[in-house]
Curated annotation (Swiss-Prot):
One of its GO terms (cellular component) is DNA-directed RNA polymerase complex. The lineage of its organism: Bacteria, Pseudomonadati, Pseudomonadota, Gammaproteobacteria, Enterobacterales. This is DNA-directed RNA polymerase subunit omega. GO terms for biological process: DNA-templated transcription. Pfam families: RNA_pol_Rpb6. It comes from Pectobacterium atrosepticum (strain SCRI 1043 / ATCC BAA-672) (Erwinia carotovora subsp. atroseptica).
Amino acid sequence: MARVTVQDAVEKIGNRFDLVLVAARRARQLQTGGKDPLVPEENDKYTVIALREIEDGLINNQILDVRDRQEQQEQEAAEIQAVTAIAEGRR
């Protein structure tokens, strides 16, 4: 298991409070959202993986926001297609 120093991750994010929010958000995505890690798992817990991704500059708040918006737009487009297909089937 790789040792993660929080100081390296803090430098990437800006302050430790935002680091906690970003790391928790990413760890939650990894655990429940079916997201794939951007670094090798190496038998680490999701929080450690999230911190390693932040240290490597692969994840920050802006990146998470962009990804969330993209996924939301894709989901909304799929829902609109489904509703349209249902509506056309009733005609």
